[in-house]
């Protein structure tokens, strides 16, 4: 039985600027979640490269990549991903434990950010004792507590009602502005994309449009100083000709660890000058 190549992310290259709120928008199966996982170093590249603050994700081994994520990245998940045996305070402390901060300091930092997300009276509650919105607030606090440079959010409001969705989005946007952080959010909900400065539309593994939002929702949620400085000249995330191959045998999918760095920034097979937005690729084999 032969193999058929499926391009999960096909000919995609782009740059996300420092301090930018970028939304990757697409329907289920569009390749948006695969793209997010590649950017965050969760899935390995088959080809291409991702540069974050001048560091190549592709060149890092697992140990270096793990350290890089701990020091630079935060994550907000659709399913919250809280540890049920731990309190809100203990869940938020976890990233600080991995950074080997002293117990007293990490508790102070965790308490401070839980108060900022409106959970000052829920610190000793476990996930099952909180609503979905409260659990996601804990997740947001955990993502921001270690002061990452970039926060990746994968369908952060997927399990929430419309009212709580607005509250969570305003919380993420406000904290990003006040701390001058970069946000990369994946969603299928076009209404959430209105909070973003840049919207990358993805369909069938390809970028169909890159839209710039001059009047994003929540622009007034940060301080005036933070809002004026959200966009910087320094590119923070650059994706170059990404490819990721997966092979299927009797419908079983396994990831490929093999990869290469492409220096060609133009269309496949053509030499091009570096630009901020280009085509990028991610392949799956079936």
Q: What is the predicted role of each segment?
A:
Residues 257-286:
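Long, low-complexity, intrinsically disordered segments
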Residues 206-234, 243:
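Conserved beta-strand-loop-alpha-helix hinge in the C-terminal portion
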Residues 15, 30-32, 220, 258, ...:
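Serine/proline-rich low-complexity intrinsically disordered segments, especially terminal tails, linkers
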